[in-house]
Swiss-Prot record:
Keywords: Cell inner membrane, Cell membrane, Membrane, Transmembrane, Transmembrane helix
InterPro entries referenced in this protein's UniProt entry, alphabetically: UPF0761_bac, Virul_fac_BrkB
Family (UniProt): Belongs to the UPF0761 family.
GO cellular component, one term: plasma membrane
Chief site of localization: membrane
Full protein name: UPF0761 membrane protein PsycPRwf_0630
Low complexity biased stretches: 482-493
Cellular compartments annotated: Cell inner membrane
Length: 538
């Protein structure tokens, strides 16, 4: 497929690359599956949501007169002409549910909040972020939306009705007057646009640029109106489904419309996300350790200037292929207590970098050290002067590790003891014994591996894949121990000379302990940038 695309004359155009990136992200994020899940959620929660809306409007006597008007506006803007029959059923259900007890009303509020939480989770998955705020904070935020939203909407309709009733605005001059029907449609469309923009800007836990949210909101609002118009025409001319479903014909049409709507809404989330990523430069993806140090260097520089660092600034130091991992990197820096979040949602330095070495920082991460091929790419695309010092030390560390590990595997296995077959009775081997056996195995591995990553709840070690879009989950069982942990475990079993292991480990520690993180970043101004002529890897 890629070979065919390269033959297209517009293959290198920016707009085509953006579309490829957008469609690829939508497929990779299982957009259609998320839309199907949200369709099912909407089907179960649409009556409770509308009931809550009507209950809040009924609680204010001044807004009682605009209940029916608001319901009609919602149905006409969100449903095509063929779905208005379903809207009558939904409205009847909501009217009957308005006479609930306090417990029933509370259950409706809980259902509404759970629906909004499900939508928020889908948006956050597209933005590659986790739920950072506590449950109480989210509940308070959504409770505010649920209660104030209908009140603001009802007040707007009251003001609109009052303006239309003014006598001087209804007078005709030379046969011309104000076409209120046209302006009502314009205002309704403007409210739809504002709703989509607010959705894309407010719901994700990431700080979405307002410009990108506005572009996505306008596109989705216009496409939504076109889709609603087209869907209504198709369904009105395609009547054979009524012969199949009979009285239930409105239900599959309604489900299909909700499914298409959620696909479009999630596509808008992808547009805002892709616009944010596409604004960065497309560079070769660096080793995660180098990306983390680059982010930490930015926070350190801003801290020295008495400033904090925003999420947008942290994302700006990453390349296009590195950006999908930015939130994971951010969590690593926070878990290592190197940075902390301010009340405004920005980040400042938390720990004195003179008191932490590169080796100590590396031991908290689930990544192996960079290898020569990755360092060659860094030297060719060096953007920060402190990399010159870092690359030299990594090259020396890899050279020494290669010397210590240059031993045939057959020679290692020659020291292994013959295995004895152990028969275990499944009737005697209980679940408690299995748990104890797993605990013993995990504690043995943790002693020779990275204790900070295993015991503090950090992510398991994973092999670095520069082309991977998202890092493996923290629950992944395919963890790989760092080379020194493997050798240490082998030395404990007697398969490798323990003196060789100690020598290798101590040498690596000394190489990285010589440089504190503050001393490393201080080379930004003094150390020269490595060029192709003085590359130590050549």
């Amino acid at each position: 497929m890629e070979k065919l695309l390269k033959k297209l004359p517009f293959y290198d155009h920016t707009w085509f690359n953006f579309l490829r990136f957008l469609i690829g992200n939508f497929i990779k994020d299982d957009g259609q599956q998320k839309a199907a899940s949200l369709t099912y959620t909407t089907l179960l929660s649409i009556v409770p949501i509308l009931t809550v809306l009507l209950m809040i409007l009924s609680s204010v006597p001044a807004l009682e007169s605009v209940r029916e008007q608001i319901s009609n506006i919602i149905y006409s803007n969100l449903l095509p002409q063929s779905g208005l029959q379903v809207s009558e059923y939904i409205n009847n259900f909501a009217e009957k549910s308005s006479n609930l007890t306090a417990i029933g009303a509370l259950a409706l509020f809980v259902t509404t909040i759970m629906t909004l939480t499900t939508i928020e989770r889908a948006f956050n998955q597209i933005w590659r972020v986790e739920d950072r705020s506590g449950g109480i904070k989210s509940i308070v935020r959504y409770w505010t939306i649920i209660t104030l939203g209908p009140l603001v909407l009802g007040t707007a309709f009251l003001v609109s009705s009052a303006v239309q009733s003014l006598s001087f605005l209804n007078q005709q001059v030379a046969g011309y007057g104000i076409d209120w029907g046209f302006w009502v449609q314009v205002v309704s469309f403007a409210v739809t646009i504002a709703g989509f923009i607010g959705m894309y800007w407010f719901i994700p836990k990431a700080k979405v640029p307002l410009k990108n949210a506005a572009i996505a909101g306008v596109f989705v609002a216009v496409t939504f109106e076109l889709l609603k118009y087209s869907f209504g025409i198709i369904m009105s001319n395609f009547t054979s489904y009524e012969a199949i479903y009979g009285a239930f014909a409105a239900l599959p049409i309604f489900l299909l419309w909700i499914y298409l709507s959620w696909n479009l809404i999630l596509l808008g989330v992808e547009i805002s996300y892709t616009l944010t990523i596409f604004a960065t430069s497309e560079v070769y993806p660096r080793h995660p350790l180098l990306s983390l140090l680059d982010m930490l260097n930015l926070v350190h520089d801003r801290y020295q200037q008495g400033k904090d660092t925003s999420e947008e600034d942290l994302r700006s130091v990453l390349g296009r292929k590195e950006l999908p991992k930015w939130f994971t990197y951010l969590n690593y820096l926070k878990d290592a207590h190197l940075i902390t979040e301010t009340d405004e949602g920005n980040y400042v330095l938390k720990k004195d970098l003179d008191n932490i070495t590169l080796w100590e920082f590396y031991r908290t991460l689930p990544y192996p050290l960079p290898i020569k091929d990755e360092l060659d790419e860094v030297c060719a695309n060096a953007r920060t002067p402190w990399l010159s010092l870092l690359v030299q030390r990594f090259v020396q560390t890899e050279k020494h590790a290669r010397q210590e590990l240059d031993i045939p595997l057959a020679k290692i296995f020659a020291h292994s003891l013959p295995r004895e077959k152990v028969e275990v009775s499944h009737s005697v081997f209980s679940a408690q014994d299995a748990d104890a056996k797993r605990t013993t195995s995990q504690s043995t591995t943790a002693e020779g591996g990275r204790q900070s990553a295993a015991e503090d709840g950090k992510f398991d070690a994973q092999p670095f894949d520069p082309n991977a879009d998202v890092l493996p989950d923290s629950d992944s069982k395919e963890a790989t121990n760092p080379p020194d942990a493997d050798i240490k475990a082998a030395a404990a079993k007697g398969t490798v000379n323990s003196a060789q292991h100690s020598k290798h480990t101590e040498t690596a520690k000394q190489e990285h302990k010589k440089t504190g993180l503050l001393g490393l970043f201080s080379h930004d101004k003094d150390a020269p940038i490595i060029t192709e002529d003085d590359n130590p890897n050549k």
